[in-house]
Regions:
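N-terminal leader segment of winged-helix/HTH proteins
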Residues: 1-44, 165
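C-terminal regulatory/oligomerization modules of transcriptional regulators
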Residues: 1-13, 135-165
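Charged, amphipathic alpha-helical coiled-coil/dimerization segments
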Residues: 4-6, 82-145
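N-terminal positioning helix adjacent to the helix-turn-helix/winged-helix DNA-binding module
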Residues: 18, 29, 48-49, 109, ...
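Alpha-helical linker/hinge and terminal dimerization helices associated
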Residues: 22-25, 29-36, 70, 113-131, ...
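Generic structural concept
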Residues: 23-26, 57-60, 107, 141-144, ...
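N-terminal helix-turn-helix DNA-binding core of bacterial DNA-binding proteins
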Residues: 32-73, 156-158
Length: 165
């Protein structure tokens, strides 16, 4: 399989802005994953709600932890969790280590949705692998992880959030 393919608009230019390319890739993956939600009855969920469910399913289980991970205020994340709870996708339970905190847990419906989101993400990744090849995607993943997890030289003064409409 070819390690480089031309897109419908032509080959990627070496000088193409990396930030724009990353945002476009992220948006495409999010759109692809969210497209699976409508037929399953969850077309009303926002990208932030879907990502929150994925985080909870992967063990991030307090509003404070979720807010830090998502780059939101605890108040905003609390509202997102309230909507997910009202939709029957998560429960708030007493936290065993902190009486002031609540532990978030997926309901049976929340676990089903988590599994659907995880499968849709895996399908999107397979499509990317088919496009560029497994070795290229592995290299891209390693490069992104190295950059994402490296210390920032200076903390930004404001948080940056991408919005996918």
């Amino acid at each position: 399989m070819s390690e480089h393919r031309q897109s419908a608009s032509g080959p990627a230019s070496p000088g193409e802005d990396l930030g724009v390319l990353l945002a476009a890739c992220c948006e495409r993956v999010v759109r692809t994953v969210l497209a699976t939600l409508g037929p399953a009855g969850y077309g009303h969920l926002t990208p932030t709600q879907a990502i929150t469910l994925l985080f909870i399913g992967r063990g991030i289980n307090t509003v404070t932890q979720l807010a830090e991970r998502a780059g939101l205020t605890t108040q905003a994340m609390s509202k997102i969790c309230a909507v997910l709870q009202a939709d029957g996708l998560l429960d708030r339970q007493p936290h065993t280590d902190d009486a002031r905190s609540r532990r978030l847990a997926l309901t049976a419906d929340g676990r089903r949705l988590h599994d659907l989101l995880s499968q849709a993400g895996a399908d999107a990744e397979r499509a990317w692998t088919d496009l560029v090849g497994a070795q290229t995607l592995q290299t891209v993943r390693a490069a992104l992880a190295a950059y994402a997890h490296s210390p920032e030289p200076a903390a930004p003064t404001t948080q940056v959030r991408l919005r996918f409409t």
